[in-house]
A protein has these predicted regions:
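Active-site rim segments in enzyme catalytic domains, especially the processed small/beta chain
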Residues: 68-75, 79-85, 89-94, 245-250, ...
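Internal maturation/activation junctions in enzymes
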Residues: 296-404, 556
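Short, small/polar residue-rich loop motifs at catalytic or cofactor-binding pockets
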Residues: 261, 383-386, 450-452
Length: 566
């Protein structure tokens, strides 16, 4: 049977894997929907559900293929966050597969001998940036709790593609060609480049037998095949022998790693319930804060592309990012006052700080009252490269999965067919500010703060209404919050909401998406006191919305994703 998404686009484009633009209209389906960043990955999830699998099965199949065909964004060498909704008992679960710092990590990890932060390449393109990968432990934990299809069967699509080959997509080709560090790694150079040093062109059939071999071992032996033994030893040795900056990862760090189940973070937005990831991700918290502040304003009376709407969204973002930067860190190390920071009276007080006619500039973190904090404020480097998957299966179960290796191609080190993460640069590089320890400072076995924001939205009757998430570094929070507003307040369909111009603030300049209608707002915003920055936006939003007859899926036209449904 031909998936609906293929019916709505040229079948030849799907089969040749040309760059797939977002549809002008959302893809509609009655039974289930899979939205992912690459057609082959989405197809793996689609096929898993067609074989009788559920949302968890599909998510595993999708992510294993993404690690092959979109290796710059996520993979076995990285981590992930996953929200799962079980329709039968209306149960929501959050899975944390965030990377951890090695046991030998210390707060001054990214400081030089002079006490100043290291230069970008010396921190990122090095062994120091690599944390213990968490993806496979997360997928295994979720499958043990909810999977229907055999674990090994979910690896088959990715193994087959890795052995037989897949065409290099235009986006992957462009990213490889533009990266000045990738060819420094011998494995990556052999894989992606021609003998003359040029990147292999788009359309080239790329085979990855090393990746297939790793997947085959994990399919047969579970995640232990990755975390205990030869593979873990090889990764740790590669990190410790990095020429630019050796790391301190050892095999024992792998065997000690575990993914965690956490309590989802939920809050009200008008008549809806919005749920996201708790810390160590700041995504769920900050999205809820932005929405909670915006709830005090009548957004429906404004046009989505108006100066007034852009002003309110940017100012709400400033306030949320200010609190995020001060309070949020790994909950095993940092006790953030989440309930107080999301309390309606606190958010109402924060909303009153917004002047409808003038920007507040840089916002200061709030004090919810009765909360003692001794944390300093410092912000990590932004390195956006991530992937998001949204799935609703035939039983109404849902998955929102956001996975990452941090920067594009992680630390640029390829081991056994996949890239290692550089997630430890998500820690704050400066461990103290004004004599106070920073909540997100580096510590042994700690998980760095993330901005990933896999999100589920429910209506007033508790029915699943929306599945959404995005890549994009620190901007993920703004991307997800604005898309939710586009759907819930301004009545856009999911494809319109995703493709709408990006705008917002991360408590710095007000950012407007280059080449869109948002650019036109710059002069008026500047007159209101905004410092405006016009830039391309790296969102890769993938979403699903309930309709009267089933589901509508949307994939971000800024990337190569598709929605497949039946």
């Amino acid at each position: 049977m031909i998936p609906r998404a293929i019916r709505s686009a040229a079948a030849a484009s799907f089969l040749l894997l040309a760059c797939v633009a977002g549809h002008a209209e959302p893809v509609v389906a009655q039974r289930f929907m899979v939205v992912a960043a690459h057609p082959l990955a989405a197809r793996a999830g689609y096929d898993a559900i067609r074989r009788g699998g559920n949302a968890i099965d599909a998510a595993i199949a999708v992510e294993l293929v993404l690690g092959l065909v979109e290796p710059q964004s996520s993979g076995l060498g990285g981590g992930a966050f996953l929200l799962h909704y079980a329709a039968r008992d209306a149960k929501l679960e959050a899975y944390d597969g965030r990377e951890t710092a090695p046991a030998r990590a210390a707060p001054g990890r990214f400081l030089g001998a002079d006490g100043r932060p290291l230069d970008w390449p010396d921190a990122v393109v090095s062994g120091k940036s690599v944390g213990v990968p968490g993806l496979l432990r997360l997928l295994e934990l979720a499958h043990r709790g909810h999977g229907k299809l055999p674990w090994a069967s979910l690896f088959e699509p990715a193994i087959k593609l890795a052995r037989e080959g897949f065409p290099i997509s235009p986006r992957l080709n462009a990213l490889v060609a533009a990266d000045r560090f990738l060819a420094l790694d011998a494995n990556a150079r052999r894989y992606f480049f021609l003998p003359d040093g040029k990147a292999k062109p788009a359309g080239t059939l790329l085979k990855n037998p090393d990746y297939a071999a790793v997947l085959a071992r994990v399919a047969a032996g579970g995640a232990d095949a990755f975390y205990r033994g030869e593979i873990a030893r090889e990764i740790a040795a590669a990190v410790r022998s990095h020429k630019r900056g050796p790391g301190d990862l050892v095999e024992a760090d792998f065997s000690a790693y575990s993914a965690k189940q956490r309590e989802p973070l939920c809050g009200a937005y008008r008549r809806w319930k919005v749920c996201g990831m708790p810390p160590p991700s700041s995504g769920g918290f900050a999205v809820l804060q932005i929405l909670g502040i915006l709830e005090r304003f009548d957004l429906r009376a404004l046009k989505p592309d108006s100066v007034e709407a852009a002003h309110l969204f940017a100012e709400s973002g400033r306030l949320a990012y200010a609190d995020r930067n001060l309070y949020i860190g790994d909950p095993d190390f940092v006790r953030a006052p989440l309930a107080a920071l999301l309390e309606p009276r606190y958010l109402a007080a924060r909303a009153k700080l917004i002047d409808p006619l003038h920007s507040m500039g840089r916002a200061r973190a709030g004090d919810p009252g009765g909360v003692a904090t001794s944390y300093g404020l410092a912000e990590p480097l932004e390195l956006p490269a991530t992937s998001h998957v949204s799935i609703v299966d035939a039983e109404g179960n849902a998955v929102a999965l956001t996975a990452s290796v941090e920067a594009a191609f992680g630390n640029r080190q390829m081991v056994r067919g996949f890239f290692l993460n550089n997630e430890l640069t998500d820690f704050s590089w400066v461990p103290e500010e004004d004599g106070k320890p920073v909540a997100n400072r580096v510590e042994a076995k700690k998980r760095p703060r993330s901005s990933m924001a896999p999100t589920l939205v429910f209506d007033e009757k508790g029915k699943l209404t929306m599945v959404i998430g995005s890549p994009g570094g620190h901007s993920i929070i703004n991307y997800v919050a604005l898309t939710i507003v586009n759907v819930l307040d301004w009545g856009m369909d999911i494809q319109q909401a995703i493709d709408a111009p990006r705008m917002g603030s991360r408590n710095g300049p007000t950012e407007l998406e280059r080449g869109t209608k948002a650019e036109r707002l710059a002069p008026a915003l500047e007159r209101m006191g905004h410092s405006v920055r016009i830039r391309p936006e790296a969102s890769g939003l993938h979403g699903i919305v309930r309709t009267a007859t089933g589901w509508a899926g949307g994939a971000d036209s800024r990337r190569e994703g598709v929605a497949l449904g039946d």
